[in-house]
Amino acid sequence: FNPALYNVEKMERVIEANRDNILGLKIRLSKGVVPDETGADYLRTVVKLADELNARLGTSLRVCVHTTNSPVTAGELADCLRPGDIFCHCFQGAGNPIVAEDGTIDPLVLKARERGVIFDAANGKGNFGLKAAKRALAAGFLPDVISTDLTVDKFNMPPYAKNLPLVISKYLALGLDFNTIIRAVTETPARLMGLEGQIGTLKAGAIADIAIFDLKDREYVQ
């Protein structure tokens, strides 16, 4: 994460050659990965780099930040982000979550949401805390995006994210409205990727990528 080692020229070439696929820059800010005392500075550097690349290339690169077990508060990280940037793993409970034990949301997190920062649940293997999720949802803080954050080596591995239907079932069990969940796994991600009206919709003329499920009320047994 040493900015002195960033190969910006190579970044430009790769982004230019893959404009249709590269939507942003991602940085992982976890304890043991970045120094405790300067964690937020690394994020500010990446945000500045995204601005510079956008100015030179005419792109609209977002910044996505991995926030699980961050060395600095969730509010400090959220305060660095621009409208449209992504606060990833918003319900992690490993360290410095967005919600305190008394159920209050970090004020800087709320301000970030007001100015358009995107909050992605991105469950993954170790990036979801049930207590943090319950507290945040009870406070009315819903995720903009619900995703799995799956990698090849974690797909179908219980009891974590496993697959998207399992993640959807988690949020149903947590009490979220079904339509709200579906919007967070289809319509909103499509819009953020610049594909609104093409995917994540049943609109006539859209790309047909459809899964049909039966909703069944039953105890989940691993």
Q: How would you label these PLM feature ranges?
A:
Residues 1-29:
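Divalent-metal coordination cores built from histidine and acidic residues
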Residues 6, 20, 82, 141, ...:
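Structured loop/turn residues at beta-strand edges in well-structured enzyme cores
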Residues 27-157:
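Active-site core of metal-dependent hydrolases
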Residues 131-213:
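His/Asp/Glu-enriched, well-ordered alpha-helical/loop segment
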Residues 5, 67-70, 192-195:
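Short gly/ser/thr-rich secondary-structure transition/capping motifs
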Residues 1-3, 102-104, 160-163:
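Short, surface-exposed amphipathic charged segments that create phosphate/polyanion-binding patches used
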Residues 217-222:
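Short, Lys/Arg- and Gly-enriched loop/turn segments at beta-strand edges
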